[in-house]
């Protein structure tokens, strides 16, 4: 491979269990992070916001997102659908079904890298 290019196979990456209902694998580059997120039905991601742009692509299952300071906008995201979340927009999510999503963050989530994402680890 050319200088700097890296190859990964998802199944070869370690899967981090955050709660009984939430696991993830992620790859970090210089300016973006790519993550497989595995949510069991009923998994709740608490309302939070971050300095990172986020794209969530649901590969399997369905998730209900609540967007805005009070969760006033709801979006049901099903397999094959993508939600773009701008930086600093408060949001939460509920896995309506067992779900696998592909999440992209730019820049990478430092709290995920260093394990200080406590809001995700409560459950």
Give names to the regions the model predicted.
Residues 35-49:
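Conserved short histidine dyad/triad with adjacent acidic residue
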């Amino acid at each position: 491979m050319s200088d700097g290019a890296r190859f990964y196979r998802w199944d070869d990456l370690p899967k981090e269990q955050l709660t009984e209902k939430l696991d993830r694998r992620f790859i970090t580059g210089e300016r973006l992070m790519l993550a497989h997120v595995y949510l069991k039905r009923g998994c709740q991601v608490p309302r939070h916001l971050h300095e990172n742009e986020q794209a969530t692509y649901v590969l399997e299952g369905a998730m209900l997102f609540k967007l805005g300071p009070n969760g006033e906008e709801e979006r049901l995201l099903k397999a094959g659908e993508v939600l773009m979340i701008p930086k600093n927009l408060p949001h939460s999510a509920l896995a309506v079904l067992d779900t696998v999503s592909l999440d992209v963050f730019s820049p990478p989530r430092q709290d995920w890298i260093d394990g200080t994402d406590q809001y995700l680890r409560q459950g």
